[in-house]
């Protein structure tokens, strides 16, 4: 049996903001917390500030990003290697 293809998820408030900006035809940054929303072709050319848990990171949407999720482009974790922490303790001695 084949499965039915579902529509991409986009938060309704984000979609309303995008439509409003498209009608104005002005470039402005759209702020969102919805990392699970898919990128639609109507979003191409806009700058969307996506929340990473601490702050909003502005991302410019281009054609290759269509179909992917907003959260894929903003990392939520900051990597600190063990070696860097170890070198700092030696310099303090």
UniProtKB/Swiss-Prot annotation:
Matches recorded under InterPro entries: Ribosomal_uS19 (IPR002222), Ribosomal_uS19_bac-type (IPR005732), Ribosomal_uS19_CS (IPR020934), Ribosomal_uS19_SF (IPR023575)
Superkingdom to which the source organism belongs: Eukaryota
Gene3D superfamilies linked to this entry: 30s Ribosomal Protein S19, Chain A (3.30.860.10)
Keyword Cytoplasm: no
PROSITE patterns reported for this sequence: RIBOSOMAL_S19
Keyword tRNA processing in annotation: no
Subcellular location: Plastid, Chloroplast
GO biological process, one term: translation
Keywords linked to the UniProt accession: Chloroplast, Plastid, Ribonucleoprotein, Ribosomal protein, RNA-binding, rRNA-binding
GO cellular component terms given for this protein: chloroplast; mitochondrial small ribosomal subunit
Main location: plastid
Molecular function in Gene Ontology: rRNA binding; structural constituent of ribosome
UniProt function note: Protein S19 forms a complex with S13 that binds strongly to the 16S ribosomal RNA.
PANTHER family: RIBOSOMAL PROTEIN S19P FAMILY MEMBER, SMALL RIBOSOMAL SUBUNIT PROTEIN US19M
Family membership: Belongs to the universal ribosomal protein uS19 family.
Annotated protein name in UniProt: Small ribosomal subunit protein uS19c
Organism of origin: Triticum aestivum (Wheat)
Upper classification of the organism: Eukaryota, Viridiplantae, Streptophyta, Embryophyta, Tracheophyta
The encoding gene: rps19-A
